Design a protein with these regions (language model features):
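Extended alpha-helical scaffold regions
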Residues: 1-558
């Protein structure tokens, strides 16, 4: 019945809902928390979603005090995940469409009057609901400790997005008596409560994980919020985390510096989120990351965690968290200081390896992704180092790695041709594609390069130069392996063979497109014959019948 009503109201506008009579619709009762109320919750939320269509509709919904309060309570307190998600999204959408014009320190917003913001943060009853529902020290009827931690997780999931919309509303205090009751410092608001007081991180390691993820989301969501100060490479979110010691505390979990004595159990649960936090920090604020002591500390940690035996690389659990962090670092931080062995990249193997290690190499060698135009343009600190410096560093790392590991391309093509190990084969092909499509600068850089091998300026020419040429081009031109003629038909081997053949075909197509540009710009350098050969292979499609071993048996029906 409720689903039918939701379908019937599907095409309605908020104006039509109002004409039907908001007084006659039991929003407050229909938004009550309870297991038996879930269908009615969904119906009431579906009707209220009509108010997200325009600032005027949202402003009208903001005038319904008891309804807004009921939505906030339902979002934080319901035991139904679907209803909680729907209610949380409704609150975000109402706040977004009602956001006033852009203010200092805030992201670009809409043209609303801010009435929903004033209702949520300015009304005492609504504002206190955040604290009462999420604080472990307060007692709310029907809410156990587990229910409170769920409410905490829901608040931490949404708060970074609200901070990106209106930093001042989230960070500043609104009702001093409410905030003081929960030990919030003078001037602090909901952000201080969530980041500093709400979670008992020393006793609840799972909520500590959620808290670290919250810090990562906050740092990333607020990257465009300039501090309007002389501090370079900064944002309001990052500045907040540093000022309150949260940045150093979280980083220390991963770095495990001498004398820190981390709890082994806590480290086991928190190491991954802390590594992801640093990966977000390094990739979102590369200039800020490079300006401090963090590059050396992170590299020292990576040198320790990535120093594994060949057997562990190939057969044990991959150090995924460390590899993700290494792939997220500015490539300038991965350049060797002196000998090549001082770079963490030198520890990544190509022979006895795993897909995660090869994906990391592919990401590092490729260089920065090609930027798209965005508005407004990001603050200065969020594009530093620029793509030219990053591309030059990626090129230098690739050639240093190749000079010190001349078997690299032999290993890569061997892995790429091993259909039985699908993930390893696909990651090896990604290494080939990443170099072909590498975003390296064509201008001369002052970064030292090895003198024992050729160092072309572009990735596609690097593939066509020794020692890569001996292995990569024959592999790309060779027909793919297929198992269509074996007993069993199109089972898993066929699927793996097709996926690998398609990835290989895409790599060859990328090489073809770049060689076409090369021949047009610089004809007569001998690439025309290679281009013609590649064109013939591409004309055969991803699955060439020449790759089949043995003959297909034809059955003649007599």
């Amino acid at each position: 019945m409720v689903n039918l009503l939701i379908k019937l109201f599907d095409g309605w506008t908020w104006q039509q809902v109002c004409e039907f009579g908001t007084q006659s619709i039991p929003f407050k009762d229909g938004l009550a928390v309870g297991e038996g109320m879930v269908p009615f919750n969904r119906l009431m939320l579906a009707l209220l979603e009509k108010a997200t269509g325009s600032p005027a509709d949202a402003a009208h919904a903001a005038s319904m005090l008891e309804t807004v309060q009921a939505v906030v309570k339902l979002w934080l307190c319901t035991g139904d995940t679907g209803v909680a998600t729907q209610a949380g999204q409704l609150i975000q959408d109402l706040l977004k469409v009602d956001s006033p014009a852009q203010g200092a320190g805030d992201a670009p917003t809409g043209g609303g009057q801010g009435l929903v913001w004033r209702r949520v943060f300015g009304d005492r009853d609504v504002y206190s609901m955040f604290f009462e529902s999420c604080s472990l020290s307060s007692k709310v009827e029907g809410m156990s400790k587990n229910a409170k931690t769920l409410a905490q997780a829901r608040l931490m999931e949404v708060l970074p997005r609200l901070a990106a919309m209106n930093w001042q509303a989230v960070a500043n205090g609104h009702h001093r008596d409410i905030e003081a009751k929960y030990e919030i410092a003078q001037g602090g608001g909901l952000l201080d409560f969530a980041a500093l007081e709400m979670v008992d991180y020393k006793e609840d390691v799972l909520m500590h994980r959620c808290l670290i993820d919250f810090f990562s989301d906050m740092m990333q969501a607020t990257a465009s919020l300039d501090t309007h100060t002389m501090a370079p490479h900064d944002s309001l979110g990052l500045q907040y985390l540093i000022t309150h010691g949260l940045h150093a505390r979280t980083s220390a979990i991963y770095l495990q510096l001498p004398g820190s004595n981390p709890d082994p159990i806590d480290s086991m649960f928190l190491y991954g989120p802390a590594a992801n936090y640093l990966a977000t920090y390094a990739s979102t604020y590369p200039g800020h990351f490079l300006a401090g002591q963090m590059p050396k500390q992170v590299n020292d940690r990576l040198m320790h965690t990535l120093e594994l035996s060949p057997g562990r690389w190939a057969h044990s659990d991959s150090p995924k968290n460390d590899l993700h962090l290494a792939a997220s670092l500015p490539r300038k931080a991965l350049l060797p200081e002196g000998s090549w062995s001082s770079s963490p990249v030198s520890l990544l193997p190509s022979k006895a390896t795993n897909p995660d290690a090869l994906h990391t190499l592919a990401t590092i060698f490729h260089g920065p992704e090609r930027k798209t135009l965005v508005f407004p343009p990001p603050a200065e600190g969020h594009t530093d180092p620029d793509s030219t410096e990053e591309g030059a560093a990626a090129r230098a790392i690739y050639y240093h790695y190749l000079a010190n590991n001349p078997r690299f391309w032999q290993d890569i093509t061997t892995h790429a041709d091993t259909v039985a190990l699908k993930d390893l084969a696909l990651s090896a092909i990604r290494c080939i594609t990443s170099v072909i499509t590498a975003e390296w600068p064509t201008t001369t850089t002052d970064l030292p390069l090895p003198t024992t091998i050729a160092t072309p300026e572009t990735g596609h020419l690097a593939i066509l130069s020794p020692p890569a040429l001996e292995y990569t081009l024959p592999y790309l031109l060779k027909p793919p392996q297929t198992f269509a003629n074996l007993v069993g038909g199109r089972g898993d081997p066929e699927s793996a063979a097709y996926l690998i053949a398609s990835a290989k075909f895409d790599a060859l197509r990328a090489l073809n497109s770049r060689l076409m540009v090369q021949v047009e710009q610089q004809p007569g350098q001998g690439y025309e014959e290679i281009l013609a050969t590649i064109g013939k292979r591409l004309a055969e499609g991803p699955m060439s019948r020449e790759g089949q071993v043995g003959g297909n048996v034809g059955v003649l029906e007599l």
